[in-house]
Regions:
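Cell-envelope/extracellular polymer assembly enzymes that use nucleotide-activated donors
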Residues: 2-4, 32
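Glycine-rich, basic loop-to-helix element that forms the pyrophosphate-binding segment
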Residues: 61-79, 89
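Short, acidic, metal-binding catalytic loop of nucleotide-sugar glycosyltransferases
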Residues: 22-30
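Short beta-strand/loop segment that forms part of the nucleotide-sugar
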Residues: 31-39, 58-62
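Acidic donor-binding/catalytic loop of UDP-sugar-dependent glycosyltransferases
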Residues: 43, 91-94
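A conserved acidic beta->alpha catalytic loop
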Residues: 22, 37-46, 64
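Short aromatic/hydrophobic "clamp" motif used to bind/position activated sugar donors
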Residues: 84
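Active-site beta-to-alpha loop of glycosyltransferases that engages the nucleotide-sugar donor
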Residues: 7-18, 28, 39
C-alpha cells in the first residue's frame, strides 16, 4: 500500500461524502482511507458508515470531540503504509 489518507471529521455533513468520493475517484487505488469521527451530531457519521464495506476503508468513531490533533494521531496510529496524507473533511482530491 502506497499511502494512507486520514480525514478527521466533526460535523462535516456538507463536505465529507464528496471528500471521500474524490479519493475513491482517483486512478491510483493503492491507498487506505481512514476517517476519524470526533462525535459528530449531524449526519456525517452516518455518511462515513456507508463506506465501511469499501476496500481499505477504516472508520474510527469517537463518542465525543477528542480534538483535531488527537484524531489525526489516531488515524496515523492505524496507518498501514509508509506515507500518510492528511485531508480536512472539506478537501477534495483532483
Amino acid at each position: 500500500m502506497k499511502a494512507t489518507i486520514v480525514i478527521p471529521n466533526i460535523n462535516g455533513k456538507g463536505w465529507l461524502k464528496d471528500s471521500i468520493e474524490s479519493v475513491y475517484a482517483q486512478t491510483e487505488q493503492d491507498f487506505e482511507l481512514i476517517v476519524v469521527d470526533n462525535g459528530s451530531t449531524d449526519e456525517s457519521l452516518e455518511q462515513a458508515r456507508g463506506y465501511c464495506t469499501r476496500p481499505n476503508f477504516t472508520l474510527i468513531e469517537n463518542g465525543y470531540n477528542t480534538g483535531f490533533s488527537h484524531a489525526v494521531n489516531q488515524g496515523i496510529a492505524r496507518a498501514r503504509s509508509e506515507f500518510v496524507v492528511l485531508f480536512n473533511n472539506d478537501a477534495f482530491a483532483e
